[in-house]
Amino acid sequence: VLFICCNFQLVLAQPMQELPVDKNVRIGKLDNGLTYYIRHNALPEKRVEFYIAQKVGSILEEPQQRGLAHFLEHMAFNGTKNFPGDETGLGIIPWCETKGIKFGTNLNAYTSVDQTVYNISNVPTENINVVDSCLLILHDWSSAIDLADKEIDKERGVIREEWRSRNSGMLRIMTNAQSTMYPDSKYSDCMPIGSIDVINNFPYQDIRDYYAKWYRPDLQGIVIVGDINVDEIEAKLKKVFADVKAPVNPAERIYYPVADNQE
């Protein structure tokens, strides 16, 4: 374990090199600050992948919010404006599965310290309505997750079980090693799984406040790659995301430094 941690630190210590921009990627930014990246890729045929990446993770949580970045990722699948998951319409998961997009395999998300990413993969392009609906899902994740009281309470139990199953010896070693790996840094105490006390007891408004504060277009990027017409997808994306407002007096997204560790 020590060998792994030491090598992990060495990797972190390497200077970041700027990646070259693929000339085949269509890159643009909407007036609200949303950035998008679209690329045609002929293989696999008649398939496309959708991603929405947030420059948001557990590093931005306040002490009373420990675990809410990860909790919010779960809530993104539990009801949105256009996919409510109730008597008025299918939720995201059942709708996707009716189109052959399997939850956990083709429909998923992850939360890390500095980012949260959602994906819809292996989407068939033959039916343009499916492609349009996937754009609508990205829209809802960006700004229209419901966060209903009853769904939050249901998800507390799901997160508790995930917390329990992940609370292994290896995770405890990693958690305890953070203060050594990142001395005097906020990175020393911001594991995405969070605090079980917070998960059990946070007020509903706390997660709504976190969502409103950090899920905003200037911190979001859309990535669409596949066997698609780039011009058509770009036009659709601009139309779908036109109603997402730019933030007013947005909170600063601080990028916390990590000091060199000589020991």
PLM regions with names:
Residues E49-S121, I173, D189-I193:
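M16/MPP (pitrilysin/insulinase) zinc-metallopeptidase core fold and M16-derived inactive scaffolds
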Residues D184, G221-E263:
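An aromatic/glycine/proline-enriched structural segment found at the starts
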Residues I38, K55-E62, M75-N82, V117-N127, ...:
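Second-shell loop/turn segments in exported
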Residues V1-P15:
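Bacterial Sec-dependent N-terminal signal peptides
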Residues Q17-I52:
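Mature N-terminal segment immediately following signal peptide/propeptide cleavage
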Residues M75-T80, A109-D114, V130-I137, W141, ...:
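Scaffold signal of the M16-like zinc-metallopeptidase fold and its non-catalytic homologs
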Residues T88-P94, D146-R164, N229, V248-Q262:
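Acidic/histidine-enriched alpha-helical segments
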